[in-house]
């Protein structure tokens, strides 16, 4: 019976393999610094360079615990928004030169101090800085992070959102341009119509008809001019990607860590509407403009 159950267990695992939670193997490299001293903790504040197996830089989330040394740390979800804003304004998202220093270690150390400050594990105003470059960069990162309104969550909206009336231009009724507003850094979106007439299409700013658009592209709707008056609805569905601060769980002795990773999400807009009317009530030719200063003149006979 036990042998039968063992075979059954192996067979079940082949059919339904267990899903392993996302994780990152992290290790650290020491570098020498004696750049700040905590007056409240009565000790220097030190850090190390933490990297994932594929070379991404991670930051410590527990000032008093040890750095990872080859452990496989599972994901915990998105990090605190204040830490996220620090990461966007610190190293390595900004180069040492952009941060105002020439040494990557100063840029890295300043970013780590700003992370701990955001978590309220240290207070940069409590530190006795022994390196003026580090002091300036740390305070600059904290100030920019505090002023930031950047969100981790991916947002998407379509403008305009009100019903649009397409107007006749040459062979098509055309809407104005729609803009897909998003904080995603990359991705694509599709426009999905419900009840659209034959020949209706979506085109970018260059007039190219497309079924899929890149983030940053605008689109308009084109309806053939012979189409009877009417309307239809549509929605925009996007597959969008941006950096998010993903926290990874340590152990009672190994610190939690955070690394910026690209994450993708599906987003769908509410239903939008477009309509059009037949020109002149009978055909789709535009009305000739009325010119009151040029009245019709009957033929006149010269005397």
Question: Where are the model-predicted features located?
Answer:
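C-terminal segment of classical bacterial N-terminal signal peptides
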Residues: 1-20
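Intrinsically disordered, low-complexity repeat and linker tracts
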Residues: 20-23, 250-303
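Short, surface-exposed polybasic-aromatic patches that bind anionic ligands, especially phosphate groups
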Residues: 22-147
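Short, solvent-exposed loop/linker segments at the N-terminal edge
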Residues: 162-174, 300-303
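Low-complexity "stalk/linker" and mucin-like segments enriched in Ser/Thr/Pro/Ala/Gly
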Residues: 185, 192-216
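Short, hydrophobic beta-strand segments
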Residues: 213-228
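Exposed beta-strand face motif in extracellular beta-rich ectodomains
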Residues: 228-234
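Short acidic/polar inter-strand loop motif in beta-rich domains
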Residues: 240-246
